[in-house]
Every structure is written in structure tokens, then in C-alpha cells.
């Protein structure tokens, strides 16, 4: 079972995916919590390039190919083996993030992205995608507050993008959800975290019949 979490910067994905993982584990499920870009040593090295705010010269097509390379390695090394063993895999971002950020956000042709995603994913697709939705002003406000309180290495290249960019990403996510309503569940990320967690648990229960 493969569940992915998506949303704009500052939507609360990391908090909510950890809460779901804990709930599933408490219910006796075997769970793997991972993320993209990253999730294994090689993919984490690629992540450091992709998210480093100093890498302003990174062009959209190179960015896209780095995401595809990271995904291919992560799937082969981490996700595919876990799924083969019957583990529930929870992934913070996956192929929909590439569609939202690199196609809707950057303007790369959707078919180019679908081709690369197909190669990188090798037939693996999520059973359920949780889209945490909030206004871009809310999400960026949270994200930048987090950055201001963080010390050490920072991964903020996307947080520094314009409001218009993030609006395109949000609109893209909502369009993707409309295209595949059977896979996506949209959760209001502006309410209290406990309410968000409850809505996610309900979605997992109703769509995948997993005790939470």
C-alpha cells in the first residue's frame, strides 16, 4: 500500500505524515516513512542540490531531470522493496509534486514530465494521495517562519519563489486532484492539526480499509 502526501510549501505535510505513521504503527501495521527528493543516501545528495537556496542558476530542465534521477534511485532502493514485503509506504511528496512544481509552476510541457515520471516510477503509482490544501499566503507564511527559526543548513530554494509561482503550483495540485478524484483526497490544511489528522485517518479508513 502506497500513500503519498502532497501540497504547497508550509501546508503541514511533514507533521501530518508523521502523525499518520504513528497511528498506523500503533494499530499494528508495518510502516515505512520516507520523502522525496531524498529517502536514501544517493537521493539525499541530489536533494541537497535541488533545495539549496544558493543554486539559483539551476535551470528548469536540469531541475526536472535531477528529480527524476532521485526518484528512480529512491524507488529502486527503498520504496519498491518495502511494497514487495507488504509494508505500508508513506511518502512526503512523489510524482505529483513534479507535475505541480515543474509543469504548472515552471511551465515545462506536461508530456515531457509524464515521460520522465513513467521512466523513473517503473509502473509504481500511489494508492492514495493526500493533498493538504491551504492558501499560498498561509503556507508561505508558515514556511518562512520555520526558516527564520532554523539554524544550520537550509533548504529554502522553493520558499524563495514568487507568490505567483506558488499559486500556479497550488492551482496545479487542485487540477491534478480533479483529474483523479478516486486517488486524491483534499484536506483543508487551515484548520487545527488534530482536525487535519482526523480527516486523513478517515480517508485512509474509508478508501483503503486500514485500521487506524
Curated annotation (Swiss-Prot):
The keyword Ribonucleoprotein does not apply. The keyword Transport does not apply. Gene3D superfamilies: P-loop containing nucleotide triphosphate hydrolases. Pfam families: Thymidylate_kin (PF02223). It catalyses: dTMP + ATP = dTDP + ADP. ATP binds at residues 7-14. It comes from the Bacteria. Keywords: ATP-binding, Kinase, Nucleotide biosynthesis, Nucleotide-binding, Transferase. GO terms for cellular component: cytosol. Its EC number is 2.7.4.9. InterPro entries: P-loop_NTPase, Thymidylate_kin-like_dom, Thymidylate_kinase. Belongs to the thymidylate kinase family. HAMAP family: Thymidylate_kinase. This is Thymidylate kinase.
Amino acid at each position: 500500500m502506497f500513500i503519498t502526501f502532497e501540497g504547497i510549501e508550509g501546508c503541514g505535510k511533514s507533521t501530518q505524515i508523521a502523525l499518520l505513521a504513528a497511528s498506523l504503527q500503533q494499530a499494528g501495521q508495518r510502516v515505512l516513512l520516507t520523502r522525496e527528493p531524498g529517502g536514501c543516501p544517493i537521493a539525499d545528495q541530489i536533494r541537497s542540490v535541488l533545495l539549496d537556496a544558493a543554486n539559483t542558476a539551476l535551470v528548469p530542465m536540469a531541475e526536472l531531470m535531477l528529480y527524476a534521477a532521485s526518484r528512480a534511485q529512491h524507488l529502486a532502493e527503498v520504496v519498491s522493496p518495502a511494497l514487495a514485503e507488504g509494508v505500508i509506504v508513506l511518502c512526503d511528496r512523489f510524482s505529483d509534486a513534479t507535475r505541480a512544481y515543474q509543469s504548472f509552476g515552471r511551465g515545462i510541457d506536461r508530456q515531457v514530465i509524464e515521460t520522465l515520471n513513467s521512466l523513473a516510477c517503473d509502473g509504481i503509482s500511489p494508492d492514495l494521495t493526500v493533498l493538504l490544501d491551504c492558501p499560498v499566503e498561509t503556507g508561505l507564511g508558515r514556511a518562512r517562519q520555520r526558516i527564520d527559526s532554523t539554524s544550520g543548513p537550509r533548504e529554502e530554494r522553493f520558499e524563495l519563489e514568487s507568490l505567483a509561482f506558488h499559486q500556479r503550483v497550488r492551482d496545479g495540485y487542485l487540477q491534478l486532484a480533479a483529474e483523479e478524484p478516486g486517488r486524491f483526497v483534499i484536506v483543508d490544511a487551515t484548520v487545527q492539526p488534530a482536525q487535519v489528522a482526523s480527516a486523513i485517518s478517515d480517508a485512509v479508513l474509508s478508501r483503503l480499509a486500514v485500521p487506524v
